[in-house]
Amino acid sequence: MKDIWSQQGRIALERDFWIAVMKAQRDLGVPIPAEAVKDYERVKGQIDLASIAKRERVTLHDVKARIEEFSDLAKRQFIHLGLTSRDLTENVEQLQILRSLKLVHFKAAAALLALAKQAELNRDLMITGRTHNVPAQPTTLGKRLAMFGEELLSAFTRLEELLNRYPVRGLKGAVGTQLDQLTLLGGDNGKVDQLESRVLKHLGFRASLSAVGQVYPRSLDFEVVTVLHQLGAAMASCATTLRLMAGAGLLTEGFQEGQVGSSAMPHKVNARNCERICGFGTILGGFVAMTTGLSGHQWNEGDVSCSVVRRVALPDSFFAIDGALETFITVMRQMEVFSAAIAAENERNLPFLATTTILMEAVKRGAGRETAHEAIKEHALAAAKALRSGSGDADLLARLAGDRRIGLGKKTLQAILSENVRFVGAAPHQVDAFLAEVHPLARKHRGAADYQPARLL
């Protein structure tokens, strides 16, 4: 990702673009000597950022400085024929975006496969499901991970859809009419279309905009950043829950040999990587706000008020999602689940976790739903208070068995609790459904299943 967005990398892309346009123009009849093309190709790798910056301090125009630099190196003046600055910058920036999206696409597939592996490993591990962060009903850890995985998969699908249709601006000139290329090519619309096709092929895009002005719609930038935010949001939600579980001692994101959790408290094992993922999500949300400010504010055929925002928001959005993906994959590979602690939490909460099942069994045996609901609520709240305060009757089962409104004896209630495996409902099958959607990604994206992220600091 760093290579795609580096200044050196961008200038290399620009020079390749100029040469591709020059070759196409020459093939279509523009009088450009073959030796001139070779001269540009010979020096295209000689990128002197200091020299370009020196020129820009004089011209106060970044593109003009880069034109002069490249032309002086080649000792020729055949690049940028019939082009405006935006013919260069828009197309090259969109190429950077396209390549970045493809890299994100691969790493998102790797993230989904890593998450799916954990979901499969923990398919049947019953945990205490929580709503409002309060014990609710049993689920499985695999289902919890699949829940967040499904959100990530939805974002991944949206990313694929965007990649399949993302259009490039193309060579459209100062206001989008292609006037200068038409003039250069003798007014031949067919040749202009051929030039456009050659540029499209060089850049690797499937489609170009046909009626665009000087700039492509900035709502496209918004669409790009929002899909990155959606990917980040799914990972951040998962990371938030892993942080909560780590705080309860139910799992760890991984703790490496020699790692220190706190400079003051030697015992600390913090979920620092999960916290980092959440931080990246916040950053991406900020860039969504920035690109929102660009959408719907184009003046006529275009202006450059968007430039300063885009120079920050676009590369940094990709750096943020790249960091989030690298960190998320690392967490999925290194996390360790403490099944004994999970079992202890289940045992502590089990009578309360079974209340909806008890309610349904009571209704099946003829109890009125609202009557039984009120009775179970009264006993559950009283038992919970007694349990937490250390005084009073905390035996929820005995309380329920003694209430005629519910109509279930102690043996029946004990039998219900003994079948606690069924309390997770369809969770294992839902995990299987998620896995069936994700596993094909390993075939479609070779290397994604085995992708090893860089070592995190």
Outline where the language-model segments fall.
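Short beta-alpha connecting loops at secondary-structure transitions
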Residues: 2-6, 51-53, 259-279, 301-316, ...
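A helix-coil-helix interface module used to build multimeric assemblies
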Residues: 1-178, 187-200, 261-262, 272-276, ...
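Long, amphipathic alpha-helical stalk/connector segments used for oligomerization, subunit docking
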Residues: 283-369, 375
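A conserved active-site cap/scaffold subdomain adjacent to cofactor or substrate pockets
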Residues: 215-250, 254, 259-320
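Glycine-rich cofactor-pocket loops
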Residues: 120-142, 252-268, 301-309, 333-353
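Short, well-ordered beta-strand elements within core beta-sheets of diverse protein domains
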Residues: 143, 222-230, 357-365
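Alpha-helical transition-metal enzyme core signature, strongest for iron centers
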Residues: 15, 60-63, 108-115, 145-159, ...
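A short, charged helix-loop
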Residues: 197-214
